[in-house]
């Protein structure tokens, strides 16, 4: 079964972009999924992913943006799930492309944060976040017990930059150190849907919201049922206690010990055990009595039963 995160990423790889946005997205993809190697005195870049659609996206962006020779390799993992691993290999103009994408400086030292030149425009900010999500992002299926979206970064500076970029859209993202790197994450459902909208995953957003609405409605119904059940149990418990106290009084000293108004209620409760307090109030001979009035008289009967259990003498008033 395809995961919600995989479906979201597949949708993102089909989006059309402006040229400036292509550069921002590609920079995030290469920075986060790329690795460098030297062979025969030549620098090459391998961009690795387990998602075929993302591999095609990287391949297309490199060919379109730089008109270079790009190799696409497929390998199978031998451990765990044994998924295919797709490697997009760039074997020419590697240094120039890394510099153009603001991943390395002229002296070939790495730039750990996000260059402002890449994200001057709002559309480019969105595209960089899209590339970062494609490269290192994950999002829980909204049907699971908790909402969670995160983007993993190897370096703290870059992770902090992603967090700052996300919070420029008022997403209230937070950072956390993991064993092998850092993450920027969202826990609020509303913020996750906002993020999906920002990066252009509109179909995923609609699916997320549909599932969330159904889930929240189901939870509301469950809470209502639980509340009603608790109230019903409380009502049943009170009725059983009242009947037991009335029987105790009757068997110990007789119901005649009770004042007339209390005795009538005691007899009604004993004879009509399944009726509600409202229905009891409608049965009283002297005229209708409210639920609170019936409850007050039943509490007095409870008090008399407790006094009898404690060995006190109860006289008819």
Swiss-Prot record:
Function: Involved in cell division and chromosome segregation.
Gene3D superfamilies documented for this protein: Homing endonucleases
Keywords, ordered alphabetically: Cell cycle, Cell division, DNA-binding
GO molecular function: DNA binding
GO biological process: one example: regulation of sporulation
Family assignment from sequence similarity: Belongs to the WhiA family.
Matches recorded under InterPro entries: Homing_endonucl, Sporu_reg_WhiA_N_dom, Sporulation_regulator_WhiA, Sporulation_regulator_WhiA_C, WhiA_LAGLIDADG_dom
UniProt feature coiled coil, ranges: none
Superkingdom assignment: Bacteria
Species this protein is from: Bacillus thuringiensis (strain Al Hakam)
Name of this chain's protein: Probable cell division protein WhiA
DNA-binding region(s) from the entry: 276-310
Family annotation (Pfam families): HTH_WhiA, LAGLIDADG_WhiA, WhiA_N
Signal peptide (residue range): none
The keyword Cytoplasm belongs to this UniProt entry's keyword annotation: no
